[in-house]
Design a protein with these regions (language model features):
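Acidic-basic catalytic patches of nuclease active cores, encompassing PD-(D/E)XK
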Residues: 2-32
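Short N-terminal edge-element motif at the start of the domain
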Residues: 23, 38, 43-44, 52, ...
């Protein structure tokens, strides 16, 4: 983790907007969808890039791992890549709770600013199912994909 350890607790609402800015710095132009139904789970954030869908689960300092196993299973059916974004409370142990192909981003408060650290970049998700992935897209998104690929 980076910077000075701080005992200030970060909540989901404190993390989201700065996270979107951080992801845009890394990936360039992105589209963000929040609270997207993903099978039997609800993805906190779905990041759409020109070539992939990313499922992003936020575990703030106030969260527990209670639902994480089921969330991982569901995310792995739908997304090309997955991230878990964790507060400092979870940073030391999160890798024990997500597969090796999941990316891990830590977040902490440093001198009053939200600071992110890429602990591990995601690898391509081996469990993604194309039919599941397509099922979460809305009609306008599917039409756009068809247009990009010269399909009627």
């Amino acid at each position: 983790m980076c910077g000075v350890q701080n005992t200030a607790m970060l909540y989901d609402k404190d993390i989201r907007e700065p996270l979107f800015e951080y992801l845009e710095e890394i990936y360039g132009k992105i589209r963000i969808l929040e609270e997207k139904k993903t099978g039997k789970a609800r993805a906190d954030v779905v990041m759409v890039t020109p070539d992939a869908l990313y499922g992003i689960e936020i575990k703030s300092d106030a969260d527990t791992y209670t639902r994480l196993e089921r969330q991982v299973r569901e995310y792995d059916r739908f997304y090309d890549y997955n991230y878990v974004v964790v507060g400092t409370r979870h940073a030391l142990h999160i890798r024990e709770h997500v597969p090796d192909w999941w990316g891990v981003i830590t977040v902490e408060l440093v001198e009053g600013a939200t600071d992110f650290y890429m602990m591990r970049r995601p690898s391509h998700n081996p469990g993604m199912d194309w039919s599941e992935k397509i099922s979460i897209l809305w009609r306008p998104e599917l039409v756009h994909i068809q247009e990009l690929n010269g399909m009627p």
